[in-house]
């Protein structure tokens, strides 16, 4: 069954696995996610579950949003997100999803908006190499070089150039959940995830093929300190 939840990125830290290897992890506070709507094939043409995350005052919503929450007797939520599922049985409006929906050893896909870097050159944005710094060249060391050939006599579309970097919605697939603190609603996810600290993350069971041999995870007694 597909698992999903919405969380907030706290930051990164390090933990030791059962073999004593140091492992970088991202601390994610997944909070109390409430089912705000259930989509069915008969009514909507597809199956999905909508979750709400984070509190917000009524003045931060438009009229249609406020009426939606009042009609369903729900508290106002800052973030709403639909997750496609094959079967909606077991989900109902008001149902709460917490960190204990996952367990250590699960693989997840994490989606979020990346950090905005502003206008960036090709070296930072596309990992280009620098130009030679010898033979009198002093003002083009970070240039991309020629942007077109003599034959077409024009710049072709799709070339890698400087421009706005970051602030894009991306998904990182097949990340390992190292530990779950159900009491504090915290997940430890191996490696880095997109988004700045305190950014919203959308977490769901991975669509990638799961390896047969899982890596060793953190001891169950490991305590997680929240900032």
UniProtKB/Swiss-Prot annotation:
SUPFAM superfamilies: Translation proteins. One of its GO terms (molecular function) is structural constituent of ribosome. Residues 129-154 are annotated as: Disordered. Pfam families: Ribosomal_L3. One of its GO terms (cellular component) is cytosolic large ribosomal subunit. It comes from the Bacteria. The keyword Metal-binding does not apply. One of its GO terms (biological process) is translation. Keywords: Ribonucleoprotein, Ribosomal protein, RNA-binding, rRNA-binding. HAMAP family: Ribosomal_uL3_B (MF_01325_B). One of the primary rRNA binding proteins, it binds directly near the 3'-end of the 23S rRNA, where it nucleates assembly of the 50S subunit. Belongs to the universal ribosomal protein uL3 family. NCBIfam families: L3_bact. Part of the 50S ribosomal subunit. Forms a cluster with proteins L14 and L19. This is Large ribosomal subunit protein uL3. It comes from Endomicrobium trichonymphae. The lineage of its organism: Bacteria, Pseudomonadati, Elusimicrobiota, Endomicrobiia, Endomicrobiales. The gene is rplC.
